[in-house]
Amino acid sequence: MSTNPKPQRKTKRNTNRRPQDVKFPGGGQIVGGVYLLPRRGPRLGVRATRKTSERSQPRGRRQPIPKDRRSTGKSWGKPGYPWPLYGNEGLGWAGWLLSPRGSRPSWGPNDPRHRSRNVGKVIDTLTCGFADLMGYIPVVGAPLGGVARALAHGVRVLEDGVNYATGNLPGCSFSIFLLALLSCITVPVSAVQVKNTSNSYMVTNDCSNDSITWQLQGAVLHVPGCVPCEKVGNMSRCWIPVSPNVAVRQPGALTQGLRTHIDMVVVSATLCSALYVGDLCGGVMLAAQMFIVSPQHHWFVQECNCSIYPGAITGHRMAWDMMMNWSPTATMILAYAMRVPEVIIDIISGAHWGVMFGLAYFSMQGAWAKVVVILLLAAGVDANTRTVAGSAAATTRGFTSMFSSGSKQNLQLINTNGSWHINRTALNCNDSLNTGFIASLFYVNRFNSSGCPHRLSVCRSIEAFRIGWGTLQYEDNVTNPEDMRPYCWHYPPKPCGIVPARSVCGPVYCFTPSPVVVGTTDARGVPTYTWGENETDVFLLNSTRPPRGSWFGCTWMNSTGFTKTCGAPPCRIRADFNASTDLLCPTDCFRKHSDATYIKCGSGPWLTPKCMVDYPYRLWHYPCTVNYSIFKIRMYVGGVEHRLTAACNFTRGDPCNLEDRDRSQLSPLLHSTTEWAILPCTYSDLPALSTGLLHLHQNIVDVQYMYGLSPALTKYVVRWEWVVLLFLLLADARVCA
């Protein structure tokens, strides 16, 4: 048995009454009645060594090593913490005015503002603040606040999805930079430039003022698919394209003023990165894009028609040119890399202090990727080119066999009270496509066309109408007299509906734009096979334009020999429409309104003011088109391919300058390896593969070139967004939410 005294239970009497340690928020404490300063040593990660005066004191409860916590995000939206953007005072007063009780909605631990960063702080502040204000409204505040909070959580889910999709890398900037950069490295299909001549519109390759993005003294950044045309005094001259969207006044002009801009961009981005204000600089850079206007150094006009008639190119020359450009990207990168040693010497000798400062700073930081970007950026300034091969000799194409004659029909036109129709005795309404009537259409050589000049005298050319402006509008209430003259391209048809089969002679053709024959049905749409003999047999022609509907319009002949039409609503090309002087466009009216395409405004067989869809009963419905020429075409409507033939009214005596050309939205067939087949005196809005421009034949009116030679240094596009993205990358600007 041990002789040691039995330990006594501690009570208030036998316990030494020593003052307890009192700790202060600043880190100091009172030990033995003496205030001790906060412990020395590192703040985080390592325990400080106890001083000699502290070693005799009892060690308190072991505190865990404090961890470094992000200072942003956790305090957002919690009670007692201020709202960002100085919104606390405003929201507090607004809540007090709206609800005397001043109750604040409870978000709980899932407050969207807890996970906000950078741009997300602004977004979540607005959405959550709106939800708080909704909750302050008396009586209905609870349901409205709940709905608003649900919307705020939904926005936060979208932001989290964006962060996850972009990789959620530290800073979140590099991944978004790569995504945006990939979207910029493209060779886009350029838009066709349109010139307003005050009376009509015409196609051109000259850049409009809206197409000029940025101007330097000797270079211009513009949208792809045009060439700047500068007017100096009374002379207009085309600039030299060095890429699809960069042009220079003379060779070498691009490098004269670009070095200063490179210095400014690099030094600004380096300072933003060094001062840790990359987010602020990036926001200022992005916001400035809305207000900065390009300086006006030049007067650009649309009078040159640059490269519109380049001359013919042989297939051998196109193959050689494409073979020389098999690897333009590798060649460009190799040329840049080979110039880096020379560029370093040029930077020092040329006193490019901005580039030198950026190279020095990012080298000390170990950001070698940014060093490479700056070197390649500087290397691209001094690049030049040398012509290797000369231009190919132009080849000519004869006029022989250019047009094929149309079909002829032995019919006679009758004028009854000013209305023209086919003689009733020539009609056999029961003929079908399998009888001898179709054969007679093509083998009868005589046609009495003496009434055609009188009949077509009421038809007007497109030049007779006023030019359009503004947004296209549809005319749903087309009211034409009984003889609405469908043989004139500019007479719009009435809306399609239900047509009794007994009033129709022959088949009903509808245009998708390919011609299709519509069969008879009953009122419910069930097909009937009685040749329209029953009174209940009808043609259901109701439809809207493709691709939403079935057809653009329909044509048939009634039992008295009159041609009838119906179609989708035509387009109003002017807000101040006047029926006597203005055009209700039922086709492609490019020369009066650049937005009036056949896809938007087409109402029947007329593809252009001079061309219509060819179909077996064309000469029965439109006998005065007997001398039209036939062309094979291909169109895409809503992703569906249509191969059909078109009949066009064009002879060699008709004018066909640029201002006389209509637009045909075709996917052209090929005449040869370098030539597209288009409708006569039109143009297709598909640019050439190599230049992005329109290249037409000056003498042959149905040829458009699909390939053109260009003095461009590179086929890739230099976009203004590249400059913004490089600045954001160098400045460490983060754009994640």
From Swiss-Prot:
Residues 190-358, 380-729 are lumenal. Residues 7-16 have a biased composition (Basic residues). Keywords: Acetylation, Apoptosis, Capsid protein, Clathrin-mediated endocytosis of virus by host, Disulfide bond, Fusion of virus membrane with host endosomal membrane, Fusion of virus membrane with host membrane, Glycoprotein, Host cytoplasm, Host endoplasmic reticulum, Host lipid droplet, Host membrane, Host mitochondrion, Host nucleus, Host-virus interaction, Inhibition of host innate immune response by virus, Interferon antiviral system evasion, Membrane, Oncogene, Phosphoprotein, Ribonucleoprotein, RNA-binding, Transmembrane, Transmembrane helix, Ubl conjugation, Viral attachment to host cell, Viral envelope protein, Viral immunoevasion, Viral nucleoprotein, Viral penetration into host cytoplasm, Virion, Virus endocytosis by host, Virus entry into host cell. The record marks F177, L178, A191, V192, A383, N384 as: Cleavage. One of its GO terms (molecular function) is structural molecule activity. A motif (Nuclear localization signal) lies at residues 5-13, 38-43, 58-64, 66-71. The modification Phosphoserine is found at S53, S99, S116. The chain crosses the membrane at residues 169-189, 359-379, 730-737. Residues 2-58 are annotated as: Interaction with EIF2AK2/PKR. Residues 122-173 are annotated as: Interaction with APOA2. Pfam families: HCV_capsid, HCV_core, HCV_env, HCV_NS1. InterPro entries: HCV_Core_C, HCV_core_chain_A, HCV_core_N, HCV_Env, HCV_NS1. This is Genome polyprotein. The modification N-acetylserine is found at S2. Belongs to the hepacivirus polyprotein family. Residues 482-495 are annotated as: CD81-binding 1. The lineage of its organism: Viruses, Riboviria, Orthornavirae, Kitrinoviricota, Flasuviricetes. Residues 2-59 are annotated as: Interaction with DDX3X. It comes from Hepatitis C virus (isolate HC-J5). Disulfide bonds join C429-C554, C452-C459, C488-C496, C505-C510, C566-C571, C585-C589, C601-C624, C611-C648, C656-C681. Glycans are attached at N196, N209, N234, N305, N417, N423, N430, N448, N542, N558, N627, N649. One of its GO terms (biological process) is virion attachment to host cell. Viral particle assembly takes place at the surface of ER-derived membranes in close proximity to lipid droplets. NS2 associates with E1/E2 glycoproteins, NS3 and NS5A, which interacts with the viral RNA and core protein to promote genome encapsidation. The nucleocapsid buds at the ER membrane where E1/E2 glycoproteins are anchored and afterward associate with nascent lipid droplet to acquire APOE and APOC. Secretion of viral particles is probably regulated by viroporin p7. Residues 2-168 are cytoplasmic. Residues 112-152 are annotated as: Important for endoplasmic reticulum and mitochondrial localization. Residues 2-75 are annotated as: Disordered. Residues 178-191 form a propeptide.
